[in-house]
């Protein structure tokens, strides 16, 4: 085998090892985004909830800063319960519809029903909770203890 071939083989192996540590993207995030838009009738873009308070977005700790942040904590806890049931909430795809009364779930499996219910509950909670711009992109190391 030529030295160049060995280098290519080594590069491929290293790439595969590195890729195995990259977490999968949350596939149902797009669905959750649409549920949010349906529930709030497009009044606020979904990305506004991605970095809000102590719990809206990746991770979460401390005491929620307000009602909207509590919605995110409840959603995180709901996903935690789904995981205890053996579900993968961030990867679970489900069927939902946006009707005149807002979003609703129409799914088949237990995991799909549970995860869709988590997302639906959060989307409706977001829609009825006041949004405080001061709680967007806060310093979580100081405010979320």
From Swiss-Prot:
Q: Identify the GO cellular component terms for this protein.
A: extracellular region
Question: What does the entry state regarding organ or tissue expression?
Answer: Expressed by the venom gland.
**Could you tell me what this protein is called?**
Basic phospholipase A2 cPt09
The catalysed reaction is: a 1,2-diacyl-sn-glycero-3-phosphocholine + H2O = a 1-acyl-sn-glycero-3-phosphocholine + a fatty acid + H(+)
Instruction: Name the Enzyme Commission number(s) assigned to this protein.
Output: 3.1.1.4
Q: Where is it localised?
A: Secreted
- Quick one: a GO biological-process term for this protein? phospholipid metabolic process
Keyword set for this entry? Calcium, Disulfide bond, Hydrolase, Lipid degradation, Lipid metabolism, Metal-binding, Secreted, Signal
For activity, the cofactor(s) needed are: Ca(2+)
What's noted on cofactor binding?
A: Binds 1 Ca(2+) ion.
Q: Active site: which residues?
A: 75, 119
Which positions are cleaved off as the propeptide during maturation?
22-27
The protein's role, per its UniProt record: PLA2 catalyzes the calcium-dependent hydrolysis of the 2-acyl groups in 3-sn-phosphoglycerides.
* First and last residue of the signal peptide: 1-21
What organism is the protein native to? Laticauda semifasciata (Black-banded sea krait)
Q: Which cysteines are joined by disulfide bonds?
A: 38-98, 54-144, 56-72, 71-125, 78-118, 87-111, 105-116
């Amino acid at each position: 085998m030529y030295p160049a071939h060995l280098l290519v083989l080594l590069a491929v192996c290293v790439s595969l090892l590195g890729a195995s540590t990259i977490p999968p993207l949350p596939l149902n995030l797009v669905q959750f985004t649409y549920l949010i838009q349906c529930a709030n009738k497009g009044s606020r873009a979904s990305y506004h909830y991605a970095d809000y308070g102590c719990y809206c977005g990746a991770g979460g700790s401390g005491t929620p800063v307000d009602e909207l942040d509590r919605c995110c904590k409840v959603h995180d806890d709901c996903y935690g319960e789904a995981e205890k049931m053996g579900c993968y909430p961030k990867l679970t795809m489900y069927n939902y519809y946006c009707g005149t009364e807002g979003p609703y779930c129409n799914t088949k499996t237990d995991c799909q029903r549970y995860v869709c219910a988590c997302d639906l509950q959060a989307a409706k909670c977001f829609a009825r909770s006041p949004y405080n711009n001061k709680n967007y992109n806060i310093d979580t190391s100081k405010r979320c203890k």
